[in-house]
């Protein structure tokens, strides 16, 4: 479930901006400039939050032609982190992410549709736990501009909800925990 969340969020976040020209960006994951977080209901009483600490990706964006934007993200599934060592070990097992067999999750965009007001729907193929399914990330442009180090940056955020069984995650967590929400924020540095 964590793989889904990361891939979906990172890819969705990268395609919504307001850039005046086409440009390619590398996702800057240092210093929490980008993250792929997830949350899932814990027994229906609260939220269990987690993140993926190791991922890479890039995106291209042209505000004048958002439909030509592209996003690619690869997440290392063993980097799942819920701040609880035993739970993280279980999430890495074949009950959930099966990191020994599927060490990465990937997202590759297939289309971007502007929905107005700096938002877009990013559709793409998410491969998680050895299963590839189309997902839609609701993305929003945050901002862009020069940074203090001579570079140029653009930022996006996005979210999607994944159904665990769609990605062959069969562990029964109860009726309140059949889906996981992915929350993605990315800042890209223009190449």
UniProtKB/Swiss-Prot annotation:
Entry's localization field: Periplasm
Family membership noted in the UniProt record: Belongs to the UPF0312 family. Type 1 subfamily.
Organism (species): Stutzerimonas stutzeri (strain A1501)
Xref: Pfam families: YceI (PF04264)
UniProt key word Signal: yes
Upper taxonomic lineage: Bacteria, Pseudomonadati, Pseudomonadota, Gammaproteobacteria, Pseudomonadales
Gene3D superfamilies, sorted: Lipid/polyisoprenoid-binding, YceI-like (2.40.128.110)
Superkingdom, natural source: Bacteria
Residues forming coiled coils: none
InterPro entries per record: Lipid/polyisoprenoid-bd_YceI, TTHA0802/YceI-like_sf, UPF0312/YceI
Signal peptide: 1-22
One Gene Ontology cellular component: periplasmic space
The protein's name: UPF0312 protein PST_3941
Predominant localisation class: periplasm
Keyword Acetylation: no
Keywords: Periplasm, Signal
């Amino acid at each position: 479930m964590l793989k889904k969340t990361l891939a979906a969020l990172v890819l969705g976040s990268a395609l919504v901006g307001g850039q005046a020209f086409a440009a390619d960006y590398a996702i800057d994951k240092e210093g929490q400039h980008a993250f792929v977080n997830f949350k899932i209901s814990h027994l229906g009483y609260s939220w269990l939050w987690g993140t993926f600490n190791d991922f890479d990706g890039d995106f291209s964006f042209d505000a004048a032609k958002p439909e030509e934007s592209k996003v690619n993200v690869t997440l290392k599934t063993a980097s799942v982190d819920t701040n609880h060592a035993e739970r993280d070990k279980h999430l890495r097992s074949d009950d959930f992410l099966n990191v020994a067999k599927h060490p990465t999750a990937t997202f590759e965009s297939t289309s971007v549709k502007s929905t107005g007001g700096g938002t877009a729907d990013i559709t793409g193929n998410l491969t998680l736990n050895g299963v590839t399914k189309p997902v839609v990330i609701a993305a929003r442009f945050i901002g862009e501009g020069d940074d203090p180090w001579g570079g140029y940056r653009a930022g996006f955020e996005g979210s999607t909800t994944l159904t665990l069984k769609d990605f062959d995650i069969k562990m029964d967590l109860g009726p309140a925990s059949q889906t996981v929400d992915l929350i993605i924020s990315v800042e890209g540095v223009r190449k």
